[in-house]
Amino acid sequence: MELFLSGKKILLLYARFFGYDVIVKEKLESLGAHVDLYDARANINSFEKAIRKINTRYYYRKQRLFHEGIQKSNKTKEYDFIFSNDVLDEEILKQYRKTFPSAIMILYIDDSVKNMKGVENTFKYFDRVFTFDKKDSETYHISFRPLFFSDVFMDENCIEGEIDYDISFVGTCHSDRLSIINLIQRKYSNYKYFFFCFMQSWFMYYYHYLLEKEYRNVDKSFFRFKPISISDVAAIMHRSKCILDIQHPNQTGLTMRTIETIGAKKKIITTNPDIKKYDFYNENNVLVIERKDPVIHKSFLIRQFQPLDENIYKKYSLNGWINDLFY
């Protein structure tokens, strides 16, 4: 793999998400590739995000201008690969094809297709299309490849650290996540918790506050408005007995946090029953709970994580993910 990517030119159009774009770039570069990284999305403020829901034309116009700038800045380069993990307008994709005709174009879908409006209409512009969702891979006849964990989660010094929490959760506050967290806290008040519930902006907080009673019952200090680094996520995981995962109700694919528990060698409590269909599933390490009536027995918290086969760690590592997408 290292020899294969050596000297390859890659244009990475990666929707920014807690620094994973930089981690992927750095890993590709460590394998010998020359990488140009851009956010797949034009920079918009909270007000513009709200406008986007009402007037999509405004957003697409801004997106096209943004990507035209990327193409003009790099038009003399002969990319071997162009990677995207976001929904790009068909006109934008046509222009990438025209500007970089020899590039292999790769799309990786890290959300459910139903949550990415129109993405299925863009498949024809890509040479390779992957999804993290097994059901979507079957429905749309595209390649299935779960997400990855980065190297920091396998840091042995962190793995052997002290345990401070029974259960920890780190994630964006969306859908019914807050109600499930509150329900678990009320039901199991004797457990030690760490919660990092990220809100993308104050605008989003007040939007939920006005419309949802659950948000009015929680002090605003509970929410975090600055994203957490991946190294800090790993540190919190290593100080926890179990990791709580609450996938979006419209998703069946496994979240990044779920895959990261493999690298961190941590047990997971999840609302996603599809985890039972994966090769790393072990009922000693995985507890599936109901969204409306979560049951978390003390016996699950105190049992030790059972190590997995070495091939599982290789498969779900960032190296394994890159190998499947680019090789």
Predicted regions located by residue number:
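Short alpha-helix at the nucleotide-sugar/activated-sugar donor binding site of glycosyltransferases
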Residues: T261-I262
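An amphipathic, basic-hydrophobic alpha-helix
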Residues: Y58-E78
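A charged, aromatic-enriched C-terminal amphipathic alpha-helix characteristic of glycosyltransferases
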Residues: K292-Y327
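Short N-terminal targeting/anchoring amphipathic segment
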Residues: L12-L13, K72-L88, I106
